[in-house]
Amino acid sequence: MLKVKNFLGSRLKSFPTRKGKSDKECCRSLTSKLSVNEEYKEAFRTNSYLETRTKAEDQLGITSCSKLSSSSPSPSSSSDLSFHSHFTDYLLDPPQETLDALMQDSSLDNLIVTFFDLSSEACDVCETLLQCLQQIKINHNKIKRVMKIGKRVCNGAKTLECSPEMLCALIFQELSRFAALKNPLCRIVNEAQFRIVHDANSDLLTKLTSKKRRIRRKIRFFKFCKKLGGYSLVITHSAIVITLLIIALHSILGVFAAPALLGLCSFCLLRKKKAKGRMHKSNKDTTLEKLGTQIDIAAKGMFILINDLDTLSRLAGRLCDEIEHRKTVAAMCAKSRKIEVLKEALREFNGHEEKFSDQLQELEEHLYLCFHTINRSRRLVLAQITGQSS
């Protein structure tokens, strides 16, 4: 969590330099960008992140195998629903069943309950995006096949099975099929799922921050009352001691009674002070302070999650535009059915292949990082709750 927070903090500070800045400031900006890149790489090397990614990829492999082994075709909506529910039960930590049982056993704050609900919804959006990435990889196989066959056509290679004309016809057919495919990311980007989740999380973050401040004010007020009570106790005992001394000194036995009364009052005052110290120690971790800790952890986790979702939204939009551009090129080439247009399209695909792969990989890495952030914050809040009840 600390590495992820440091990485996000550095990322928020790393904006492009404005015009007119000195060379020294530009060098500092470049150094800052390099350090951000190192922190970026370090965040993806942590064991917890690697465990989350391995767990998700293993489940994706199991799900893909089960889909391939399924003999009877089923509607896409039902298959997506089964994938979604099974994947949620497998990856979300702590699972929802554990939280439901905890909510029945103990009374949780409404904001904490909302935090768990919204983090689960954010995980749902990430799972939907993960499904889209898997479909993008499947669709991209058509472009890979087109580039492979097109390379042979452009080089003038001849085969016994197919003539160059048949290979071109096969390429145009593959491009036409690719252009007819739906862009998987359009469903997320156009329906503004990220924006809906972002607004809900931002609203919760505002409420968590406000409640955290109120709890801190209450804790300060209670501490002030304790100090005021302690001072009042000292003043009261001092007044009693002075009164007893005056009475004792005006009596016949004042000389003998004064030391005894003074010692007795001092002893009582000391015992009261020790009892007060023990009471202050036992009440240090009060229910209010523990609730404040839960609210604070939930607010920090929500802040990081909002930044992660914003990053995912930008990366998904960028990749969505790249896919739409490829579909446009494929549609133009399939419609023209000219070898010159085909060669230009192949140059376009080959020239942007590395860029496309980098964008896909970066989005996938941030997606698994978001999974890790969700589970990490949920575990930390749950640890505070169970520590309170135990």
Curated annotation (Swiss-Prot):
It is a multi-pass membrane protein. The keyword Transmembrane helix applies. It comes from the Eukaryota. The keyword Membrane applies. It holds the Pfam family DUF677. Keywords: Membrane, Transmembrane, Transmembrane helix. Signal peptide: none annotated. The chain crosses the membrane at residues 228-248, 250-270. It is found in: Membrane. GO terms for cellular component: membrane. Its main location: membrane. It comes from Arabidopsis thaliana (Mouse-ear cress). This is UPF0496 protein At1g20180. Belongs to the UPF0496 family.
